[in-house]
Amino acid sequence: MSETPQKRLYIKTYGCQMNVYDSERMADVLRPLGYGIVDEPEGADLVVLNTCHIREKATEKVYSELGYIKQMKGRKAEAGGQMTVAVAGCVAQAEGQEIMRRQPAVDLVVGPQAYHQLPELIARAHRATGERLSADFAADEKFDALPAERQVSGVSAFLTVQEGCDKFCTFCVVPYTRGGEWSRPPEQIEDEARRLADQGVREVTLLGQNVNAYDGGGYTLARLVRRLAKIPGLDRIRYTTSHPRDMGDDLIEAHGELPELMPYLHLPVQAGSDKILKAMNRDHTAESYIRLIEKIRQARPDIAMSGDFIVGFPGERDGDFEKTLDLVREVGFASAFSFKYSRRPGTPASAMPGQVDEAVKAERLERLNQLLDEQQKAFNILQVGKTMPVLFEKKGRNPGQIVGRSPYLQAVHAVGSEDLLGQIVPVRIESSAKMSLGGVLETQPLPEPA
């Protein structure tokens, strides 16, 4: 008896880590239907674009990609085959009807809280009957419906614990595309984490739009992290993305007490001007952010700080931008992400007066990036001569080379056996670059944490 040919599934992921997680879970949902992942869209039976709506450029990329997909779909139809095209994620949530109007090649649209409905939507598309757009805000229903088993490759994995946002920063579409803040039950999270550890995952990154606002039936994020830290084989825990307003004392204490909680924290600030922060509805000041960083560093002196910045927000003058540079100099970031303000339809900031010229945005972004690059290089140079535990994840580009991650999230390159992949190994750092470190394997094991 011959086996049924596997159906080919191509997923292209745009945007944040949560979209990466969502794409993996879509594959899990579709696997029982016979779909297997392929690396290229040409010839695929099902193409899913998992989209990001944070910036205008990301949205336009989707429509551009759909033009290419339409041609592929036509070629497959001419050859007697069928390609089903789905748009998922935040653009789907925000512009579902517009997507289907602008691009008839799209067969179905599914928002980020409804991708568990993909099998039914695909069936409707094949029957050419029924609603083929789902943008429900039902995160609890989604997670209850997802398969318990995840198929992961590698020793690091993302794990969504919280979704949505109640902060309503005036520049941001997340509350409109992901809905309000919602937290998964801790038991469900622990079960998924244990299953990951059983598959050889050594490091998990807990995900949420406001992950430190996690509230799982009396569980704060700190309490959840302490619970997960007890799972055998799960040696490293990270989390992203955080809001300064929700950085509680218990979470700061966890950074100082738990060796499993990595000394790396991504804590967006966006701007250094209180006037701009107020216009953004950030609910913190530059000074309160700086004091918070000081408190975190008192608990964990070696912590590497990362941040997000937006330049050219409406009303930002030269003096406001200089205050952002001042904040960067005072805090000192190991890494950061910086962007020009992007006007998003429906957000309060899009209608604000004082929209900044694109050329001014570009000049400010260049200056900010230069300062941030200098700080990142300086942080990496400070690691030279130190020995640190590195979780090796994959083969390097050069023969005999393996690549892993430091506790501070830098890529670390070393010559070593592939047998070390999946292992945490002490490495003496001997060189640094902007984005990575180079080192040699130590023969002596690292001392146990005090």
Swiss-Prot record:
Catalytic activity, reaction form: N(6)-dimethylallyladenosine(37) in tRNA + (sulfur carrier)-SH + AH2 + 2 S-adenosyl-L-methionine = 2-methylsulfanyl-N(6)-dimethylallyladenosine(37) in tRNA + (sulfur carrier)-H + 5'-deoxyadenosine + L-methionine + A + S-adenosyl-L-homocysteine + 2 H(+)
InterPro entries: Elp3/MiaA/NifB-like_rSAM (IPR006638), Methylthiotransferase (IPR005839), Methylthiotransferase_CS (IPR020612), Methylthiotransferase_N (IPR013848), Methylthiotransferase_N_sf (IPR038135), MiaB_methiolase (IPR006463), rSAM (IPR007197), rSAM_horseshoe (IPR023404)
The enzyme's E.C. designation: 2.8.4.3
Primary localization class, coarse: cytoplasm
Cofactor binding, per record: Binds 2 [4Fe-4S] clusters. One cluster is coordinated with 3 cysteines and an exchangeable S-adenosyl-L-methionine.
Cofactor dependency: [4Fe-4S] cluster
Cell compartments where the protein resides: Cytoplasm
Keywords: 4Fe-4S, Cytoplasm, Iron, Iron-sulfur, Metal-binding, S-adenosyl-L-methionine, Transferase, tRNA processing
Listed Gene3D superfamilies: Methylthiotransferase, N-terminal domain, tm_1862 like domain
SMART domains named among the record's database cross-references: Elp3
Superkingdom of the source species: Bacteria
Metal-binding listed as a keyword: yes
Pfam families: Radical_SAM, TRAM, UPF0004
CDD domains on file: Radical_SAM (cd01335)
Binding site for [4Fe-4S] cluster 1: 16, 52, 90
Domain TRAM: 381-443
Residue ranges of every copy of the MTTase N-terminal domain listed in the record: 7-127
Binding residues annotated for [4Fe-4S] cluster 2, in chain numbering: 165, 169, 172
GO MF annotations in UniProt: 4 iron, 4 sulfur cluster binding; metal ion binding; N6-isopentenyladenosine methylthiotransferase activity
Radical SAM core domain boundaries: 151-378
NCBIfam families linked: miaB-methiolase (TIGR01574), MiaB/RimO family radical SAM methylthiotransferase (TIGR00089)
Family stated for the protein in its record: Belongs to the methylthiotransferase family. MiaB subfamily.
Subunit structure of this chain's protein: Monomer.
Function: Catalyzes the methylthiolation of N6-(dimethylallyl)adenosine (i(6)A), leading to the formation of 2-methylthio-N6-(dimethylallyl)adenosine (ms(2)i(6)A) at position 37 in tRNAs that read codons beginning with uridine.
Protein name as it appears in the record: tRNA-2-methylthio-N(6)-dimethylallyladenosine synthase
Organism in which the protein naturally occurs: Caulobacter sp. (strain K31)
